[in-house]
Structure formats: C-alpha cells, structure tokens
Amino acid sequence: TKNLKWKLKLPGYGASSPIVWNDRVYLTCYSGYGAGSRGGSPSGLMRHLVCVDARTGKSVWQQQLKPTKSEDNYSGMGVPQHGYASSTPATDGKAIYVFLAKSGLAAFDLKGKKLWQTSVGSSSSRKRWGSSSSPIIHGDLVFINALQEGHKIFALNKADGKIAWQWGPDAYSSYQDTYG
C-alpha cells in the first residue's frame, strides 16, 4: 500500500475495467440486487457510471442507471461470476459510451448528462450468461456485440444513438467478443 495514491469507496460492485481520459477515470459498478449479500429483488438493481478525478481520487459525478428492462436473474453460469457491471465504458473524448445489457447502449457527455439510450434487444440465452460486451468506437460509429440481447452486432451513430446497421446470425452465441 505504500505506492497507493488514493482509494475510493464505490457505490457497488463491478467487473468492468476503468478507462482514463485526461485527468478523469470512468468506471461502472452495480448495487442492489445480486450485490453484497447477493439477495434482494431484481427490481432493486441499479447500475452506476462513476467519474473520478485521477489526481485526487475524489468522485466528480455519478449517474444512477435503473434498468429499463428486466435483467437475467442472479443465477446460472455467467451472472454470479461477473455481476451486472462487466462492460467497460468507452470514450472518444466527447462522450462516454456504456453498454447496459438489456437496457441498451447509452451515451453521456463528459459532465454526466445522458445524451441518448438505444435498445439493442432484451433476449436471454438458455444458459443465462449475462452481458459483458464493451462498446468499440470507430469514426462516427459505436459498435456493440449484442448477440445475447439482440442476436446481432450493432453499429450506432455516436451523435444520436440511431442504429446505422446491424448484422447477425439471428441466433444466440455463447461468447461476446467484438473485433475491429
């Protein structure tokens, strides 16, 4: 701990990786259902997008993101292993893009204001893996592998969240890797 510069108590658990842009760190976590004692009701699930000052470790802002659609139960093969905050955010320096599983892909400005949120499906695989895909940015598009939720890979316009195109086998997949 002698090299530890700062430490911040988060509002919940998470398996996503933090990202850094200039002097800010962005990360996701979740609280309520499936957190801590692993009890509670699915209606209590809350995701959080947290912005931290990289120099001081102080929270700059937080967004609480209540699911818009029911998520997989905290059981099965995937969700108990990684929880409800496995997707790593992405940024282009103008917005933060966060995959919220069955609640879709959302964009926030760097001050935490929600710009848009777009559904990409709400299905579940038989094994209930849960979601772990992370958005990828290229040019004017943000990509998400939503094979669990929407049976497709989606490209959305960064500016407004409208779906530019989608491709997929129209079948469930076991893993969610996206390569660009």
Where do the language-model regions lie?
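Noncatalytic, solvent-exposed loop/strand surfaces
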Residues: 1-180
